[in-house]
Amino acid sequence: MRGLVQRVIRAEVKSRAADSSEWSVAGAIGPGLCVFVGATHDDTVAQADKLASKIWGLRILDDSEGVMNRSLSDVHETGGPATVLIVSQFTLYGDTRKGRRPSWIDAARPEHAEPLVDRVVDQLRSLGATVTTGVFR
C-alpha cells in the first residue's frame, strides 16, 4: 500500500453522481492530515494496519515552538483533534516510464482495494483519529 501524506490547514474532496453535473463535498477537515491511499494487487490487511499505524505515529505536526515534532497520537493525547481526510487514489500506482499514457496495471481492482482503504480508516478511528473520507469510485 502507498500513502501520500500532506499536512493541511483545511482540505476537502468533492464528488458527483454519475447522473449529475453537480459537485458536492464528500469530505472536509480543518487542520490535520490529508492522506491519499492506494493499494496494489498483493496488499494485505496487515499492510493496511501498518500504514494506519505509520500515519498515526508520523511526527510531522508542529509543536508549540513550530518544530515538526508531534504526531496525530501526540495531538490526541493532549486533547486536540487528530483529524485525517483519507482519499482513495489508484493513481498512486500509475506507471509513466513508457510513453505519455500512464499504465494502471499495478493498481488493485476496486473489489480488492476498497476493503483495504476501509481498513486503514477503521484502524485510524480505533486509535482515536477523527477520520473523514472521500467516495470510493
Residue ranges of model-derived segments:
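N-terminal, polar/charged subdomain of small-to-medium soluble alpha/beta proteins
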Residues: M1-G99, P115-R137
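A charged helix-plus-loop insertion that forms the helical arch/lid used to bind
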Residues: K98-R109
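Conserved acidic
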Residues: H112
